């Protein structure tokens, strides 16, 4: 266009010819721009296909012909019996002969440094992985025999990876629960601290969340996940760093309400935060994949302080 102005001034082309050239240039370049967009979408489609293909090729949790033991309600006795475990494609074992027993209604904290294996305990208890050796038992039954649906309905869990879905706050709390009543959802939200921020929004529990809870703070996401774990009133609560993203005041309030709510249930808290030790009576310290200490928290003060020195990455 700039060069065309000089050509018009020199009388070599007309104004109409310049305008026609600009129009034709735009039409010639438009398909190239669309081609670039198409290539971008192709790469996105290929990435999505690979993810879906990996999901479809994964081993089924319910293989055809497999029969499970139905346990609609569990008492909450948890036992690790000489459990050894290594993650796929890892040469170093995450757990090495871990053994302990937690009685129904007992309140226990599992502590350890980064990479010690304490979060691996949670994943094995939920059946997300199977031990290489030994057994994980609930109510004296190997969890590999228990129907996975029954197992997870009886264990309310909060893991470090917070997963929220596109939907309302109510739907994110109630997902996985069997026909939850509004009263159950509201009570779980109150205990977890969801009520504190939802009550101020005009949409309330119908507030729409983006995928993975985009737009919410880390503490708000954790509160919704904790409410999800509580809504079914499971006999076992498994909480892995449930308040790590909350501010001090919110954490204090949640702990106070949890202490009352956990009465009569088996509570397993995996943490490096000493504030959560108010919820428990017993401490198990995991060191390098083994049980380094196990006993009443009052006699394990030195060990717990040492174990609480790092953040979890196991």
Model-derived features: positions:
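Transmembrane alpha-helix boundary and packing residues in multipass membrane permease domains
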Residues: 2-6, 50, 241
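An intracellular "coupling" helix at the cytosolic face of ABC transporter transmembrane type-1 domains
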Residues: 1, 41-44, 54, 58-61, ...
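A hydrophobic transmembrane-helix motif
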Residues: 1-22
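Pre-NBD coupling/linker segments of ABC/ABC-like ATPases
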Residues: 61-73
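Cytosolic ends of transmembrane helices, especially the final helix of ABC transmembrane type-1 domains
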Residues: 28-55
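Conserved catalytic core of two-component sensor histidine kinases
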Residues: 22, 29, 152
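ABC-type nucleotide-binding domain
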Residues: 71-314
């Amino acid at each position: 266009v700039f060069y065309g102005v000089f050509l018009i001034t020199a009388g070599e082309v007309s104004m109409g010819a310049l305008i026609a050239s600009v129009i034709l240039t735009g039409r010639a370049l438009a398909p190239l721009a669309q081609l670039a967009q198409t290539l971008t979408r192709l790469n996105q489609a290929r990435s999505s296909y690979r993810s879906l293909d990996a999901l479809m090729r994964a081993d089924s949790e319910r293989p055809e012909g497999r029969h499970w033991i139905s346990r609609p309600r569990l008492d909450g006795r948890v036992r690790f019996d000489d459990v050894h475990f290594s993650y796929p494609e890892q040469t170093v074992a995450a757990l090495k002969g871990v053994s302990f027993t937690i009685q129904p209604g007992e309140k226990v904290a599992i502590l350890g440094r980064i990479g010690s294996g304490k979060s691996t305990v949670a994943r094995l208890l939920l059946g997300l992985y199977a031990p290489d050796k030994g057994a994980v038992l609930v109510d004296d039954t190997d969890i590999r025999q228990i129907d996975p649906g029954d197992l997870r309905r009886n264990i309310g869990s909060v893991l470090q990876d917070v997963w929220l879905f596109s939907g309302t706050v109510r739907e994110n709390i109630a997902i996985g629960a069997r026909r939850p009543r509004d009263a159950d959802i509201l009570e779980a939200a109150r205990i977890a601290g969801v009520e504190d921020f939802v009550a101020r929004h005009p949409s309330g529990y119908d507030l729409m969340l983006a995928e993975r809870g985009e737009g919410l703070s880390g503490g708000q996401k954790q509160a919704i996940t904790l409410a999800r774990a509580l809504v079914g009133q499971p006999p076992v609560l498994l909480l892995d760093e449930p308040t790590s993203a909350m501010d001090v005041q919110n954490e204090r309030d949640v702990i106070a309400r949890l202490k009352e709510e956990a009465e009569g249930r088996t509570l397993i808290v995996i943490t490096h935060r000493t504030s959560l030790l108010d919820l428990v009576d017993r401490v198990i310290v995991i060191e390098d994949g083994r049980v380094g200490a196990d006993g009443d928290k009052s006699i394990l003060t030195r060990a717990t302080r040492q174990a609480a020195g790092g953040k979890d990455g196991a």
